[in-house]
Amino acid sequence: MKTYTVAVLGATGAVGQEMIKVLQERNFPVGKLVPLASARSAGKTVKFRGEDVTIQEAADTAFKGVDIVLGAAENDIAKRFAPAIVASGAVFVDNSSAFRLNPEVPLIVPEVNPEDVKNHKGIISNPNCSTIITVTAVNALNTIAPIRTMTASTYQAVSGAGAGGPIELMNEVEALREGKTYEPKVFSHQIAFNLIPQIGGEQFEGYTSEEMKMQNEGRKIMHLPELKVSCTCVRVPVVRSHSISVSCHFDVPVTVEQAREVIATAPGCKLVDDLKNKQYPMPLDTSDQDIVFVGRIRPDLTDDNGLCLWCCGDQVRKGAATNAIQIAELLVKE
C-alpha cells in the first residue's frame, strides 16, 4: 500500500491533537508524520501509533517531501505558510477560515460535495464547525427539493473556543460553588450557568462573523448561490459538541416522512427522532463521534413549505479534525 508523509501544522492545539488521533483511528496510510508547531513546542513529542514523534518548528523548509499538510493553526499562520506548502508540492487541507471563500479554493464536506476536491490548486479549506454539522444534516433535504432559505440558532460548546474554554467553565463553576469571584479570560462574560449570544465580532447588519459563515459557506458547499440564511450563534456552558436548531424552507412542501427517510440513509447522519420515547440528539451522546445526529423533525408552523430539525455533532471531530482527514482520504483516492 502506498503511504504518505503527512504534516500537522499546529500539532499541539486541540484540533491538531485530534487530527493525529483520527489519523490513527481511521488507519490513514501515513508513512511518516511531521508534527509542526511554534518554536516553544519544538523538541517536545507527540504519540503516534505508540511511538514518540518529535515536534518540529514550523518553517518554510519543513514542508519539503511532505505530501499532505493538515492545517490546525490560526488564519495568520495559515496565510504565512500556504505559499511554501503549495510550492513544495504538498496539498494543504486548512482548518482556518483564511481561504474558505476564495473562489479558487474548494470548501469541502465529503458527505456533501466530494466532487469539488478535484478542483484544488494546492489548497482545500475545511469549513466552519457549525457549518459542517448543519450542512451534513440538511443536505439530504436538498436532494428532495432545493433549500431556499434557512433559519438557524447554534448552541456552541465552550471547547469551540479552544482548550481554555472548558477550563474557564470549570473554574467558574468551582468559584461560584465556593462563593468566590472569577474574572473571565476566555469569554467576554461569565459562561457558567449563562449563555453568551455573540461568537465573533460584528460583520454585517448586526450579524457576527460566526453567523455569516453559515450563509456564505453553506452557499458554496451546497452549490446554492442564492441561499439565504439567518443565524444566531450562542455560546453555551456545554463542554463538547455543538447543537443547531434549523428551519429549512423550500419552494414546494417536503413532508416529515420524506425528511426522515432521506436523513436515515444520508452519509454522515444518524436519525435519532422519537419524541414519545424521549430520543433525540444531545451533546453528551455525540461527543467523540464522527457523525451528525439529527432529530426533532417536524413541520414549520409558520411556512407550509418548511421543516424544522435539531442536530448535534462533535465540533472538534466532525466539525474539524475528522472532516479534514476525510478530505485527505478523498485526495489519496484520486
Model regions and ranges:
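N-terminal Rossmann-like NAD(P) cofactor-binding subdomain of oxidoreductases
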Residues: 1-191, 227-228, 278, 292-293, ...
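Charged docking surfaces used in two-component/phosphorelay signaling
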Residues: 69, 158-334
